């Protein structure tokens, strides 16, 4: 009888421990307002609890807001001002819920503006285009116990030969909810940029004609973790290559950087 109780207690302990360290769930929050259709990732169950969930979701919502603002005049698109105002407004414990409502409101306004812009072109310039639109999707590249990597892509079309591809990648610490910078992954004083750039240079040498010139990876460049195996440095169209090249990515095996990694990516 005692053995049965011990085994039951052990099983319960294992189930609780597994739940405590399980990767978070990622669900889709749909923003569909007429010609604006964006799928927004929202997480629940980060290791850092609701505080981390809220912080991560707030950041993901902000990046969607940036996509929406591409449809607005340049005078309304100062990233630093936007982020400061956004963080001040939605920094509360449950601010991500209010932020989602705000994103929906902005999407409604953007949809209205796109419709008005198209009608103006039809009236004064003429066009065979049936709609202007803004679409967005996301892809979870890595969801582990400690880190989450998400890519958010969008596409806005407002006439012309082609639209504009929108791209962002972000990696989060699931314990704190903080967005991770490239430097955070490596030991202090390590030559991580030199090592990464060596791999990138070798890949470019295989087909240098598609690039504008040499590519130098810097702190602040976009990146994501792919399946816990690769560090992927990513650049939107026009940043390092022509539009036709799409989003340019360089996959660097983490095994080759294991001696200078400061974190356990799992």
Q: What positions do the PLM features span?
A:
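Compositionally biased intrinsically disordered regions enriched in Thr/Gly
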Residues: 20-266
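Sec-dependent N-terminal signal peptides of Gram-positive bacterial secreted proteins and lipoproteins
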Residues: 2-22
């Amino acid at each position: 009888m005692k053995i049965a109780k011990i085994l039951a207690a052990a099983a319960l302990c294992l189930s609780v421990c597994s739940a405590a360290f399980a990767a978070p769930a990622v669900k889709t929050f749909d923003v569909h307002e007429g010609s604006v259709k964006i799928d927004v990732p929202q997480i629940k169950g980060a290791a850092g609890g609701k505080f981390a969930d809220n912080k991560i979701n707030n950041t993901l919502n902000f990046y969607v807001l940036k996509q929406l603002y591409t449809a607005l005049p340049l005078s309304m698109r100062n990233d630093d001002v936007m982020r400061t105002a956004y963080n001040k407004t939605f920094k509360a414990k449950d601010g991500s819920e209010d932020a989602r409502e705000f994103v929906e409101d902005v999407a409604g306004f953007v949809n209205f503006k796109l419709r008005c812009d198209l009608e103006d072109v039809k009236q004064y310039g003429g066009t065979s285009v049936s709609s202007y639109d803004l679409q967005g999707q996301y892809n979870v590249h890595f969801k582990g116990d400690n880190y989450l990597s998400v890519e958010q892509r969008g596409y806005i079309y407002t006439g012309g030969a082609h639209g504009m591809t929108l791209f962002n990648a972000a990696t989060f610490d699931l314990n704190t909810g903080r967005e991770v910078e490239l430097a955070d992954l490596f030991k202090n004083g390590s030559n991580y940029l030199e090592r990464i750039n060596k791999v990138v240079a070798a890949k470019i040498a295989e087909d240098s004609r598609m690039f504008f010139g040499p590519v130098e990876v810097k702190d602040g460049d976009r990146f994501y973790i792919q399946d816990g195996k690769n560090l992927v440095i990513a650049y939107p169209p026009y940043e390092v290559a022509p539009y036709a090249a799409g989003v340019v990515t360089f996959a660097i095996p983490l095994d080759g950087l294991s001696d200078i990694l400061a974190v356990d990516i799992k």
